[in-house]
From Swiss-Prot:
Primary gene name: trmFO
Molecular function terms, GO-annotated: flavin adenine dinucleotide binding; tRNA (uracil(54)-C5)-methyltransferase activity, 5,10-methylenetetrahydrofolate-dependent
Protein name: Methylenetetrahydrofolate--tRNA-(uracil-5-)-methyltransferase TrmFO
Primary location recorded for the protein, binned into one broad class: cytoplasm
Annotated organism of origin: Sphingopyxis alaskensis (strain DSM 13593 / LMG 18877 / RB2256)
Broadest EC class assigned to this enzyme: transferase
Function per UniProt: Catalyzes the folate-dependent formation of 5-methyl-uridine at position 54 (M-5-U54) in all tRNAs.
Family the entry assigns: Belongs to the MnmG family. TrmFO subfamily.
Catalytic activity annotation: uridine(54) in tRNA + (6R)-5,10-methylene-5,6,7,8-tetrahydrofolate + NADH + H(+) = 5-methyluridine(54) in tRNA + (6S)-5,6,7,8-tetrahydrofolate + NAD(+); uridine(54) in tRNA + (6R)-5,10-methylene-5,6,7,8-tetrahydrofolate + NADPH + H(+) = 5-methyluridine(54) in tRNA + (6S)-5,6,7,8-tetrahydrofolate + NADP(+)
CC terms in the record's Gene Ontology section: cytosol
Subcellular location: Cytoplasm
Keywords, sorted A to Z: Cytoplasm, FAD, Flavoprotein, Methyltransferase, NAD, NADP, Transferase, tRNA processing
HAMAP family: TrmFO
Length: 449
């Protein structure tokens, strides 16, 4: 007889959240994670659970007017370990929720390691289990052997996209006689003071020279089988954005609007922002600067940015290929694989995009599995909630033939009544979601009883 009630494969944000939810519901979990067992992915740097690779940001924490902030709120209400540890390890980031990555991963790892209902096994799983309840949360960097097994079980090749990583700079190597601290419009966040970002200003000539440098810079070459792989729009390499037009960056990650340079009293023509990456404030990441430039080229070009002339880099940018399944075609509304319903999928492998979204789907998958283990059925969260809207997109709301990774956004929610004014719509979505979640939680409590 198995020593566990359910097997979770993958110790990223989705798998960690799923393990916590099931353990808290009283079920024994076997959590398999290949990192720390002799294997590593192309993007991870350590073996901690819930390691954040591309960014330290959970994006906006505004639950009244932002869809991802609403998702934060819903997950907190449902006892999310990911949100608990994010709140415990947050660093100043304006109205966004950003964390110290190492403290965050350490907190999640410690919580799961100490839970009496969770057994963490450092092992690589090469094939989908043929029996026993399972949640596959291996993320976009699933081991090739398991990816082949998934393809065989689904009859479908995995879909893929490219994801990019932004560089991290040592704080003491930034020239603060040129750069300055400020948040856009001096916005004060939950733990900040309206001065949460380091801003490096560029004038018109410097900006155009920088863009030309991006276009001319030597870039990572793709293998033949990678050349038709698209980029994810939400994590686009900065040089690819520059290829879309010389002004693209100035109206994107390098926009100077709302940032008064204290030395000129004016907004800069363009700006490079850096966000605190750890609690000590010693590491800062370049916001929106995901890149596939070769490392030597990154150092040369980024040191042409005013204030970063002597920058020392703790990590340079990079590119990795992410895989996901065609979820709307392959999964039912309970995230079960239609061809093998003892298996659920969760996290980024389902085609949701973003750390929070990944953890949210892990949470929902675990709730469904807990109900099934108890011999009951839990209805999906209503589509009016952020959890439900994201779930609907993954399990049928999207066109399976053109399915691509998606962040949570209000476009996934059912429309509001026509008489709601445009300026009131975001609050309308979030208020409606709050009522719908409360009703669903009442139903869920009855199912768990």
């Amino acid at each position: 007889m198995a020593d566990h009630d359910i097997h979770i494969i993958g110790g990223g944000l989705a798998g960690s959240e799923a393990a916590w939810q099931l353990a808290e519901a009283g079920y024994h979990v076997r959590l398999s994670e290949m990192r720390g067992g002799g294997d590593m992915t192309p993007a991870h740097q350590g073996d901690g659970l819930a390691e954040m690779v591309c960014s330290n940001s959970f994006r906006s924490d505004d639950g009244d007017s932002n869809a991802v902030g609403l998702l934060h709120r819903e997950m907190r209400a449902l006892g999310s370990i990911i949100m608990r540890e994010a709140d415990a390890t947050k660093v100043p980031a304006g109205s966004a929720l950003a964390v110290d990555r190492d403290l965050f991963s350490g907190g999640v790892t410690r919580a799961l390691s100490e839970h009496p209902n969770i057994t963490i096994v450092r092992e690589r799983i090469d094939k989908l289990p043929t029996e026993g309840l399972t949640i596959v949360a291996t993320g976009p960097l699933t081991a090739a052997s398991l990816a082949e097994s998934i393809g065989a079980a689904t009859g479908k090749d995995a879909l893929a996209f490219f994801d990019a990583i932004a560089p991290i700079v040592y704080r003491d190597s930034i020239d603060m006689d040129i750069a300055w601290m400020a948040s856009r419009w001096d916005r004060v966040g939950p733990i900040g003071d309206g001065r949460d970002y380091i801003n490096c200003p560029l004038d018109k000539d410097q900006y155009y020279a920088f863009v030309q440098g991006l276009l001319d810079g030597e870039k990572t070459e793709f293998k033949d089988w990678e050349k038709d792989t698209p980029y994810f729009e939400g994590c686009m390499p900065i040089e690819v954005m520059a290829e879309r037009g010389v002004e693209t960056l100035r109206f994107g990650p390098m926009k100077g609007v709302g940032l008064d340079n204290p030395r000129t009293g004016r907004w800069p023509y363009a700006v490079v922002q850096l966000r605190q990456d750890n609690a000590l404030g010693t590491l800062w990441n370049m916001v929106g600067f995901q890149t596939k430039l070769k490392h030597a080229e990154q150092v040369r070009l980024f040191r042409t940015i005013p204030g970063l002339e002597k920058a020392e880099f703790a990590r340079l940018g990079g590119l990795h290929r992410n895989s996901f399944i065609r979820s709307p075609e392959l999964l039912d509304r309970q995230l079960r694989l239609k061809s093998a319903p003892h298996i659920r999928f969760a996290g980024q492998i389902t085609g949701c995009e973003g750390y929070v979204e990944s953890a949210a789907i892990g949470l929902v998958a675990a709730r469904f599995a807990a109900a099934e283990l108890g011999g009951r059925a839990l209805p999906p969260p209503p589509p009016e909630t952020a959890l439900g809207a994201l779930l609907c997109h993954i399990t049928g709301g999207a066109d399976a033939s053109s399915y691509q990774p998606m962040n949570v956004n209000f476009g996934l929610f059912p429309p509001l009544a026509d008489d709601v004014r445009k300026k009131d719509r975001k609050l309308g979505y979030t208020q409606r979601a709050g009522k719908a979640l409360a009703e669903w939680m009442t139903v869920a409590a009855g199912v768990a009883a």
